[in-house]
Amino acid sequence: MTVVIPEYITPLIPWVRGIVGLVLIGVIFMGAMGAVWLERKLSADIQTRMGPCRVGKYGLLQLVADAIKLFTKEDLKPLNADSLLFNNANIFMLGSVFLMLVALPVGAVFINGVEYPLAVTQMDISVLYIEAVSALSIFGIFMVAYGSNNKYSLLGAFRNFARMVGYEVPLGITVISVAAMTGSLNIVDISTAQGLHWNIFLQPLGCFVFFVSLMADMGRLPFDQNESEEELIAGWITEYCGMRFGLGFFAEYIHMILGSFLVALLFLGGWNVPGFIANNSFFGIIVPTGFLIVKVVFVLMVIIGLRWAVPRFRIDQVVDLSWKKLLPLALLNLVWAVGLGLYLGA
């Protein structure tokens, strides 16, 4: 997709991208806080209890109270911990999600019929870039586990590594399948090309494989073997407390938000609205991004609901599911996607 930009706007592009980047960081942080609240309230509804309701209207200020609690807790460090690894691990975990945000559009606006994606930058290989930098968080997890000098933390990190190695392969194959059918590795082009023909209907098998692999990549139930409380206390994050724990916890929720955006952009049509024609500036700014956010919230609710619907798998079951079930399905979907792409002339 090529957008013709007037010459007088060209010098302002770096400033606009910087402002958009700062705004997106704030929006994603607020979205992660909203995801925490949504999970607690939805989990409470599933379990027929009230959930957060004491601090603020509908418990909305409970997150502020939790943040104050974490800020005021003492920052403890194990006696035999490696200070360099232990203190800097959060940089990799937060850096991973922020690097994803650079190429991930969180919406689009239509001005005079021209589409302007809300992204810091557009890359021709943005899908591969996002998948690559999302894997950097494993370095932070290993730094925490090894630097903590704790057997439970290290075992949790080993489980995380075994899971990620298995599920990154089918995840990558499904991404390539979508790109092959669309004819582009640019996530903006993939979202725009769907129109009314969403990829979830053209590649239902690919959507299933991608979603399951994404759940494993995020470490959500039933794939949270790296921090299963009954076996490993808190897994790789056992020795973290205070804001160190808070930042690691927060990075997981930001990752979940960005993963939901990926599902919506790759398979649910992105910001495309059925029957919507961007001939009005006001609706062209509000409607597409709002529709994408609705899809993201829906995906979040599915992820949260599965936590209470599916039991945790054993680590051997997780590995078998990846290599023996999802990988063949991903390859089958790739053949289907290539054939469909040739038929559609991608």
Curated annotation (Swiss-Prot):
The chain crosses the membrane at residues 18-38, 91-111, 125-145, 170-190, 196-216, 257-277, 284-304, 326-346. One of its GO terms (molecular function) is reduced coenzyme F420 dehydrogenase activity. InterPro entries: F420H2_dehydrogenase_H, NADH_UbQ_OxRdtase_su1/FPO, NADH_UbQ_OxRdtase_su1_CS. It comes from Methanosarcina barkeri (strain Fusaro / DSM 804). The gene is fpoH. This is F(420)H(2) dehydrogenase subunit H. It is a multi-pass membrane protein. The keyword Oxidoreductase applies. Keywords: Cell membrane, Electron transport, Membrane, Methanogenesis, Methanol utilization, Oxidoreductase, Transmembrane, Transmembrane helix, Transport. It is found in: Cell membrane. The keyword Electron transport applies. The FPO complex is composed of at least 13 different subunits. FpoA, FpoH, FpoJ, FpoK, FpoL, FpoM and FpoN proteins constitute the membrane sector of the complex.
